[in-house]
């Protein structure tokens, strides 16, 4: 089984990483004093790679991805995309959340159209309509284009959110437990759809999940976080299965259960969750939550607006 210690200082890079998280720490002030969420996190991501991040609640997974998205800044260290420091949200990175963040009074078509209008304001009406249709078709929602969020299922809402994110034409797609609220069948369907979209669009994907089986099916590498406070990357598992992946073939492979058991041992034996820990989730931040909802709901327009204020 191929694993690596992401904090090993002897690791060297042959060339500049596409996405580089370098010695990142995050500290929040609290009434009881400073609280260190992350400490010394290092991760290099190749262009086109699919990375899943897993760990117990409160280990800083969302905090880490918020720094990649630009919604939050590290207390120490740097996050760089193509060797450029990330200091704010931007159209090269787009997030999809578990709770969809769609505008409920607008149709699926109009929710995606907002993103297309933001990125391609100079294109003709016909060209914009073709782009919206393209992204809705990509996620299998052509027939539901005129339906509003309240008229479609949770899985379809998440498809709209993914289509809207893709319409921004990001280089990095950031997914924060996007399928966590879905039933098992819908979740598996969307996992297959996500892999298809990832392949066809040459995306780099960072995805938070609590589902080891989901991570083993989707990821090139599984990043496993230690517990907080002062969480860091404990180990990274290389997922060896050939692509395109077949779920039945993978689950019949003995290596699948070796990897699964290794990840389970990491999470529930070596880093068992302390139920008495006062911090069950990343520190709440109402201002950050508002920014995330706005960006999710309005796409690039909200990102551009927030970057200016």
Features from the language model and the residues they span:
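Helix-to-loop junction immediately C-terminal to a conserved catalytic motif
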Residues: 69
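Conserved ABC transporter NBD signature motif
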Residues: 77-89
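Conserved ABC ATPase "signature" region
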Residues: 124-144, 196
């Amino acid at each position: 089984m191929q694993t690596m210690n992401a904090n090993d200082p002897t690791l060297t890079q042959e060339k500049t990483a596409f996405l580089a998280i370098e010695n990142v720490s995050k500290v929040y002030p609290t009434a009881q004093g400073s609280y260190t969420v992350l400490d010394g996190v290092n991760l290099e991501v190749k262009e086109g790679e699919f990375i899943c991040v897993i760990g117990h609640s409160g280990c800083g997974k969302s905090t880490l991805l918020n720094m990649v998205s630009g919604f939050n800044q590290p207390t120490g260290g740097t996050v760089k995309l193509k060797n450029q420091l990330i200091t704010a949200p931007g159209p090269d990175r787009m997030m999809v959340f578990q709770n969809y963040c769609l505008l409920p009074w607008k149709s699926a078509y109009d929710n995606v159209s907002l993103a297309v209008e933001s990125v391609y304001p100079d294109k003709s009406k016909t060209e914009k309509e073709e782009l919206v249709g393209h992204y809705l078709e990509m996620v299998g929602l052509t027939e539901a284009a005129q339906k509003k969020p309240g008229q479609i299922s949770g899985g379809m809402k998440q498809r709209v959110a993914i289509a809207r994110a893709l319409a921004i034409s990001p280089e990095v797609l950031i997914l924060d437990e996007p399928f966590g609220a879905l039933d098992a069948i819908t979740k598996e369907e969307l996992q297959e759809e996500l892999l298809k979209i990832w392949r066809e669009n040459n995306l780099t994907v960072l995805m938070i999940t609590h589902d080891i089986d989901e991570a083993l099916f989707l990821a090139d590498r599984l990043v496993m976080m230690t517990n907080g406070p002062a969480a860091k990357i404990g180990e990274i598992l290389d997922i060896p299965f050939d692509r395109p992946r077949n779920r039945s073939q993978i689950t019949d492979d003995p290596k699948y259960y070796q990897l699964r058991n290794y990840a389970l041992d990491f999470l529930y034996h070596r880093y068992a969750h302390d139920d008495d820990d006062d911090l069950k989730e990343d520190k709440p931040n109402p201002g950050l939550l508002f920014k995330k909802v706005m960006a999710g709901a309005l796409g690039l327009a909200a990102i551009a607006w927030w970057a200016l204020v």
